[in-house]
Amino acid sequence: HLHCLEAMQIANDFRLSLIPIVEKEAVYLGAVTVNDLLQAIGKIVGVRDAGAVIVLEMEQRNFSFSELSRIVESNDAQVAQLNTYWEPQSERLIVTIKINKFEVSDIINAFQRYEYPVKYYFGEELYENELRSNYEHLMNYLNI
């Protein structure tokens, strides 16, 4: 039995659109399509789960699941999903966090307060935070 991530790696390595399923005795049982694998991986990463996504970029030595989780949980949310990958161009770790609520203003502010660079996010921000940000941009512009 292969995990869907292993099957996806095989499909990618050999550029397959269909992966045959065989028993040890080479008896053909059926096939799995790449689309089937994408749907399975989508379930694993919670594509359809409600909530916001926050993407951080950091040095690998600064990554601490417990610290990131503590920051999220201290803002009345929970980590529903956390994935990481190494970005060779920037030589930094990209951390994608899915949380169980859409409003992210307090969590974004907390990450910034603890000096975790927020690369981007998909969620809702309170109107007052947008207003404050626009005001700060205007003041910076007027000071130029």
What would you call each of these model-derived segments?
Residues 17, 29-37:
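Short hydrophobic beta-strand motif reused across regulatory alpha/beta modules
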Residues 1-15, 22-23, 38-46, 64-75:
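The conserved cystathionine-beta-synthase
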Residues 41, 50-144:
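A conserved regulatory-domain signal marking ACT and ACT-like small-molecule sensing domains
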Residues 17-19, 95:
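Conserved beta-strand core positions
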